[in-house]
Protein backbone atom coordinates (compact mmCIF):
# COMPACT_ATOMS: atom_id res chain seq x y z
CA UNK A 1 0.00 0.00 0.00
CA UNK A 2 1.35 3.39 -0.99
CA UNK A 3 0.56 7.05 -0.39
CA UNK A 4 1.66 10.43 -1.75
CA UNK A 5 3.44 12.62 0.79
CA UNK A 6 3.18 16.42 0.97
CA UNK A 7 6.07 16.75 -1.50
CA UNK A 8 4.35 14.57 -4.07
CA UNK A 9 6.68 11.62 -3.52
CA UNK A 10 5.18 8.12 -3.57
CA UNK A 11 6.00 6.19 -0.40
CA UNK A 12 5.01 2.91 1.21
CA UNK A 13 2.70 3.01 4.22
CA UNK A 14 4.60 1.62 7.23
CA UNK A 15 3.33 -1.60 8.77
CA UNK A 16 2.99 -2.31 12.47
CA UNK A 17 6.22 -4.16 13.08
CA UNK A 18 6.27 -5.68 16.62
CA UNK A 19 10.07 -5.49 16.58
CA UNK A 20 10.09 -1.81 15.62
CA UNK A 21 12.09 0.28 18.10
CA UNK A 22 13.14 3.92 18.09
CA UNK A 23 15.18 6.29 20.14
CA UNK A 24 12.36 8.33 21.67
CA UNK A 25 14.54 11.39 22.09
CA UNK A 26 16.13 11.28 18.66
CA UNK A 27 15.20 14.37 16.68
CA UNK A 28 13.49 16.07 19.62
CA UNK A 29 13.54 19.85 19.79
CA UNK A 30 15.90 21.73 22.08
CA UNK A 31 12.90 22.66 24.25
CA UNK A 32 11.94 18.99 24.67
CA UNK A 33 15.49 18.00 25.60
CA UNK A 34 15.77 20.92 28.02
CA UNK A 35 12.49 20.02 29.75
CA UNK A 36 13.49 16.37 30.00
CA UNK A 37 16.97 17.06 31.38
CA UNK A 38 16.14 19.92 33.73
CA UNK A 39 12.54 19.34 34.80
CA UNK A 40 11.36 15.76 34.33
CA UNK A 41 14.51 14.18 35.75
CA UNK A 42 14.30 16.34 38.88
CA UNK A 43 10.58 15.61 39.30
CA UNK A 44 11.25 11.88 39.03
CA UNK A 45 13.79 12.15 41.83
CA UNK A 46 10.97 13.18 44.20
CA UNK A 47 8.25 10.84 42.93
CA UNK A 48 7.74 9.12 46.28
CA UNK A 49 7.45 12.40 48.19
CA UNK A 50 5.02 13.86 45.67
CA UNK A 51 2.84 10.76 45.56
CA UNK A 52 2.54 10.35 49.33
CA UNK A 53 1.80 14.06 49.77
CA UNK A 54 -0.97 14.07 47.14
CA UNK A 55 -2.55 10.85 48.43
CA UNK A 56 -2.63 12.21 51.99
CA UNK A 57 -4.30 15.45 50.85
CA UNK A 58 -6.97 13.60 48.86
CA UNK A 59 -7.60 11.02 51.58
CA UNK A 60 -7.90 13.66 54.31
CA UNK A 61 -10.28 15.91 52.38
CA UNK A 62 -12.35 12.97 51.11
CA UNK A 63 -12.89 11.79 54.66
CA UNK A 64 -13.80 15.20 56.06
CA UNK A 65 -15.47 17.54 53.60
CA UNK A 66 -16.74 16.86 50.09
CA UNK A 67 -16.37 20.50 49.02
CA UNK A 68 -12.73 20.57 50.08
CA UNK A 69 -12.15 17.24 48.39
CA UNK A 70 -13.55 18.46 45.05
CA UNK A 71 -11.26 21.50 45.21
CA UNK A 72 -8.25 19.29 46.00
CA UNK A 73 -9.35 16.89 43.27
CA UNK A 74 -9.38 19.64 40.64
CA UNK A 75 -5.85 20.72 41.58
CA UNK A 76 -4.44 17.18 41.69
CA UNK A 77 -6.38 16.01 38.65
CA UNK A 78 -5.20 18.93 36.51
CA UNK A 79 -1.62 18.47 37.68
CA UNK A 80 -1.69 14.73 36.91
CA UNK A 81 -3.13 15.14 33.41
CA UNK A 82 -0.90 18.07 32.42
CA UNK A 83 2.20 16.30 33.75
CA UNK A 84 1.24 13.13 31.88
CA UNK A 85 0.72 15.14 28.71
CA UNK A 86 4.21 16.61 29.02
CA UNK A 87 5.78 13.19 29.66
CA UNK A 88 3.92 11.59 26.75
CA UNK A 89 4.97 14.44 24.47
CA UNK A 90 8.60 13.83 25.41
CA UNK A 91 8.28 10.04 25.13
CA UNK A 92 6.26 10.23 21.89
CA UNK A 93 3.35 8.40 23.47
CA UNK A 94 0.73 11.05 22.67
CA UNK A 95 -1.60 8.49 21.10
CA UNK A 96 -2.36 7.19 24.60
CA UNK A 97 -4.13 10.49 25.31
CA UNK A 98 -7.02 9.64 22.97
CA UNK A 99 -7.94 6.48 24.89
CA UNK A 100 -11.45 6.08 26.34
CA UNK A 101 -10.24 6.55 29.91
CA UNK A 102 -9.24 10.15 29.23
CA UNK A 103 -12.75 11.01 28.02
CA UNK A 104 -14.06 9.88 31.41
CA UNK A 105 -11.46 11.99 33.21
CA UNK A 106 -12.25 15.08 31.12
CA UNK A 107 -15.94 14.51 31.82
CA UNK A 108 -15.18 14.34 35.55
CA UNK A 109 -13.32 17.67 35.39
CA UNK A 110 -16.31 19.19 33.57
CA UNK A 111 -18.70 17.87 36.22
CA UNK A 112 -16.48 19.13 39.03
CA UNK A 113 -16.07 22.64 37.60
CA UNK A 114 -19.28 23.41 35.75
CA UNK A 115 -21.99 20.78 36.21
CA UNK A 116 -22.27 19.61 39.82
CA UNK A 117 -26.05 20.00 39.58
CA UNK A 118 -26.48 18.51 36.12
CA UNK A 119 -28.05 15.06 36.40
CA UNK A 120 -27.15 14.02 32.85
CA UNK A 121 -23.47 14.89 33.30
CA UNK A 122 -23.46 13.15 36.68
CA UNK A 123 -25.02 9.97 35.26
CA UNK A 124 -22.62 10.01 32.30
CA UNK A 125 -19.58 10.43 34.52
CA UNK A 126 -20.72 7.88 37.06
CA UNK A 127 -21.61 5.16 34.57
CA UNK A 128 -18.32 5.55 32.68
CA UNK A 129 -16.00 5.76 35.67
CA UNK A 130 -17.57 3.04 37.83
CA UNK A 131 -17.40 0.45 35.08
CA UNK A 132 -14.90 0.17 32.26
CA UNK A 133 -12.52 2.93 33.41
CA UNK A 134 -12.10 1.68 36.98
CA UNK A 135 -11.85 -1.98 35.95
CA UNK A 136 -9.06 -0.97 33.58
CA UNK A 137 -6.93 -1.12 36.75
CA UNK A 138 -7.16 -4.90 36.43
CA UNK A 139 -7.15 -5.05 32.63
CA UNK A 140 -4.06 -2.82 32.37
CA UNK A 141 -2.31 -4.50 35.30
CA UNK A 142 -1.89 -1.24 37.27
CA UNK A 143 0.08 -1.25 40.50
CA UNK A 144 0.72 1.43 43.10
CA UNK A 145 4.44 1.93 42.64
CA UNK A 146 5.18 5.18 44.50
CA UNK A 147 8.61 5.36 42.88
CA UNK A 148 7.34 5.49 39.28
CA UNK A 149 5.48 8.52 37.95
CA UNK A 150 3.88 6.74 34.98
CA UNK A 151 2.48 3.88 37.06
CA UNK A 152 1.12 6.28 39.66
CA UNK A 153 -0.48 8.47 37.02
CA UNK A 154 -2.23 5.44 35.52
CA UNK A 155 -3.52 4.55 38.98
CA UNK A 156 -4.88 8.09 39.45
CA UNK A 157 -6.56 8.16 36.04
CA UNK A 158 -8.38 4.90 36.74
CA UNK A 159 -9.20 5.27 40.46
CA UNK A 160 -9.75 8.98 41.20
CA UNK A 161 -12.93 9.13 39.06
CA UNK A 162 -14.59 6.10 40.67
CA UNK A 163 -13.66 7.27 44.20
CA UNK A 164 -15.07 10.74 43.47
CA UNK A 165 -18.33 9.48 42.00
CA UNK A 166 -18.71 7.09 44.95
CA UNK A 167 -18.45 10.03 47.36
CA UNK A 168 -20.88 12.18 45.35
CA UNK A 169 -23.40 9.37 44.86
CA UNK A 170 -23.45 8.24 48.49
CA UNK A 171 -22.70 11.52 50.31
CA UNK A 172 -25.89 11.15 52.39
CA UNK A 173 -24.31 8.03 53.95
CA UNK A 174 -20.76 9.34 54.19
CA UNK A 175 -21.05 12.90 55.55
CA UNK A 176 -22.94 14.14 58.60
CA UNK A 177 -23.35 17.57 57.02
CA UNK A 178 -24.58 16.26 53.67
CA UNK A 179 -27.61 18.59 53.80
CA UNK A 180 -25.20 21.47 53.20
CA UNK A 181 -24.45 20.01 49.78
CA UNK A 182 -28.06 20.13 48.58
CA UNK A 183 -28.50 22.79 45.94
CA UNK A 184 -24.77 22.88 45.22
CA UNK A 185 -24.05 19.23 44.41
CA UNK A 186 -26.48 16.91 42.67
CA UNK A 187 -28.99 15.34 45.09
CA UNK A 188 -28.89 11.56 44.74
CA UNK A 189 -30.43 10.52 48.06
CA UNK A 190 -33.84 9.58 46.64
CA UNK A 191 -32.60 7.60 43.65
CA UNK A 192 -33.92 4.04 44.00
CA UNK A 193 -33.69 1.03 41.73
CA UNK A 194 -36.44 0.94 39.15
CA UNK A 195 -36.66 0.65 35.38
CA UNK A 196 -37.06 4.34 34.63
CA UNK A 197 -35.32 7.13 32.72
CA UNK A 198 -32.39 7.21 35.16
CA UNK A 199 -31.81 3.47 34.76
CA UNK A 200 -31.82 3.74 30.97
CA UNK A 201 -29.37 6.65 31.06
CA UNK A 202 -26.92 4.79 33.29
CA UNK A 203 -27.24 1.84 30.92
CA UNK A 204 -26.85 3.70 27.62
CA UNK A 205 -24.63 6.74 28.26
CA UNK A 206 -21.34 4.80 28.27
CA UNK A 207 -22.20 3.39 24.83
CA UNK A 208 -23.09 6.81 23.42
CA UNK A 209 -19.73 8.19 24.52
CA UNK A 210 -18.01 5.02 23.33
CA UNK A 211 -19.44 5.37 19.80
CA UNK A 212 -18.26 8.99 19.59
CA UNK A 213 -14.82 7.98 20.89
CA UNK A 214 -14.57 4.95 18.59
CA UNK A 215 -15.29 7.04 15.47
CA UNK A 216 -12.65 9.63 16.44
CA UNK A 217 -10.16 6.91 17.39
CA UNK A 218 -10.72 5.05 14.12
CA UNK A 219 -10.28 8.18 12.01
CA UNK A 220 -7.08 9.23 13.80
CA UNK A 221 -5.53 5.77 13.62
CA UNK A 222 -6.49 4.83 10.07
CA UNK A 223 -6.47 8.18 8.32
CA UNK A 224 -4.31 10.85 9.93
CA UNK A 225 -1.42 8.69 11.13
CA UNK A 226 -1.38 6.48 8.06
CA UNK A 227 -1.63 9.38 5.64
CA UNK A 228 1.46 11.10 7.00
CA UNK A 229 3.23 7.88 8.05
CA UNK A 230 3.79 8.91 11.65
CA UNK A 231 5.17 5.49 12.50
CA UNK A 232 7.60 6.91 15.05
CA UNK A 233 4.80 8.26 17.26
CA UNK A 234 2.39 5.38 16.77
CA UNK A 235 2.39 4.61 20.47
CA UNK A 236 -1.01 3.80 21.95
CA UNK A 237 -2.86 1.09 23.83
CA UNK A 238 -3.60 -0.60 20.54
CA UNK A 239 0.14 -1.11 20.13
CA UNK A 240 0.20 -3.00 23.43
CA UNK A 241 -2.80 -5.19 22.66
CA UNK A 242 -2.06 -6.20 19.10
CA UNK A 243 1.23 -7.79 20.19
CA UNK A 244 -0.44 -9.99 22.83
CA UNK A 245 -1.19 -13.68 22.32
CA UNK A 246 -4.76 -13.16 23.58
CA UNK A 247 -5.40 -10.67 20.78
CA UNK A 248 -4.11 -13.12 18.17
CA UNK A 249 -6.21 -15.97 19.58
CA UNK A 250 -9.39 -13.88 19.42
CA UNK A 251 -8.90 -12.01 16.17
CA UNK A 252 -6.18 -13.76 14.20
CA UNK A 253 -3.50 -11.92 12.24
CA UNK A 254 -2.73 -8.70 14.11
CA UNK A 255 -1.43 -6.98 10.98
CA UNK A 256 -4.88 -6.92 9.33
CA UNK A 257 -7.65 -4.52 10.39
CA UNK A 258 -5.91 -4.00 13.72
CA UNK A 259 -7.84 -0.88 14.72
CA UNK A 260 -11.24 -2.46 14.06
CA UNK A 261 -10.28 -5.56 16.02
CA UNK A 262 -9.04 -3.48 18.93
CA UNK A 263 -12.31 -1.51 18.99
CA UNK A 264 -14.27 -4.77 18.89
CA UNK A 265 -12.34 -6.05 21.91
CA UNK A 266 -12.93 -2.72 23.66
CA UNK A 267 -16.68 -2.99 22.98
CA UNK A 268 -16.78 -6.55 24.34
CA UNK A 269 -15.09 -5.30 27.50
CA UNK A 270 -17.63 -2.46 27.79
CA UNK A 271 -20.56 -4.85 27.37
CA UNK A 272 -19.12 -7.13 30.04
CA UNK A 273 -18.75 -4.42 32.69
CA UNK A 274 -22.10 -2.68 32.08
CA UNK A 275 -23.91 -4.72 34.79
CA UNK A 276 -21.11 -3.67 37.15
CA UNK A 277 -21.93 0.01 36.60
CA UNK A 278 -25.59 -0.61 37.39
CA UNK A 279 -24.80 -2.55 40.57
CA UNK A 280 -22.43 0.20 41.71
CA UNK A 281 -25.02 2.88 41.03
CA UNK A 282 -27.87 1.27 42.94
CA UNK A 283 -26.06 -0.42 45.84
CA UNK A 284 -23.99 1.52 48.36
CA UNK A 285 -22.49 -1.64 49.85
CA UNK A 286 -21.58 -3.14 46.48
CA UNK A 287 -20.07 0.16 45.33
CA UNK A 288 -18.03 0.45 48.53
CA UNK A 289 -16.76 -3.13 48.33
CA UNK A 290 -15.91 -2.59 44.67
CA UNK A 291 -13.90 0.56 45.44
CA UNK A 292 -12.04 -1.26 48.23
CA UNK A 293 -11.31 -4.12 45.81
CA UNK A 294 -9.79 -1.70 43.27
CA UNK A 295 -7.56 -0.12 45.92
CA UNK A 296 -6.53 -3.48 47.36
CA UNK A 297 -5.73 -4.78 43.89
CA UNK A 298 -3.33 -1.88 43.33
CA UNK A 299 -1.56 -2.62 46.61
CA UNK A 300 -1.52 -6.39 46.11
CA UNK A 301 -0.29 -6.11 42.54
CA UNK A 302 2.50 -3.82 43.67
CA UNK A 303 3.53 -6.32 46.35
CA UNK A 304 3.80 -9.01 43.64
CA UNK A 305 5.87 -6.73 41.42
CA UNK A 306 8.12 -5.79 44.34
CA UNK A 307 8.64 -9.44 45.21
CA UNK A 308 9.62 -10.18 41.61
CA UNK A 309 12.12 -7.31 41.61
CA UNK A 310 13.61 -8.48 44.91
CA UNK A 311 13.97 -12.02 43.54
CA UNK A 312 15.80 -10.66 40.48
CA UNK A 313 18.18 -8.71 42.71
CA UNK A 314 18.79 -11.78 44.88
CA UNK A 315 19.51 -13.96 41.83
CA UNK A 316 21.96 -11.40 40.45
CA UNK A 317 23.68 -11.24 43.83
CA UNK A 318 23.91 -15.04 43.97
CA UNK A 319 25.47 -15.17 40.49
CA UNK A 320 27.94 -12.48 41.51
CA UNK A 321 28.89 -14.45 44.65
CA UNK A 322 29.41 -17.63 42.64
CA UNK A 323 31.80 -15.83 40.28
CA UNK A 324 33.84 -14.66 43.27
Show where each model-derived region lies.
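Helix-loop boundary elements of multi-pass alpha-helical membrane proteins
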Residues: 28-45, 80-99, 114, 136-152, ...
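Transmembrane helix-loop junctions and nearby membrane-interface residues
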Residues: 62, 81-88, 109-116, 137-140, ...
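Membrane-interface helix-loop-helix junctions at boundaries between adjacent transmembrane segments
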Residues: 86, 90-102, 107-191, 195
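Generic multipass alpha-helical transmembrane bundles of integral membrane proteins
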Residues: 146-255
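C-terminal transmembrane-bundle signature of multipass membrane proteins
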Residues: 210-324
Amino acid sequence: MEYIDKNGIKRKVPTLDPNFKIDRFEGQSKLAKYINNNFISKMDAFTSVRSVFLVLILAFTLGNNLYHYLIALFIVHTYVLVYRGIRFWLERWLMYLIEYCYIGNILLIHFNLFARNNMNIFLSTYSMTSGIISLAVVACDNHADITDTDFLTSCCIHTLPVATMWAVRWKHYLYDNYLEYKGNIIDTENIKFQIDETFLKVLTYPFIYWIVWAVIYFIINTKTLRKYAYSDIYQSTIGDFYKSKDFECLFGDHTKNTVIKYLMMHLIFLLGVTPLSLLNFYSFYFNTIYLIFILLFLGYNQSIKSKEEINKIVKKAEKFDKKD
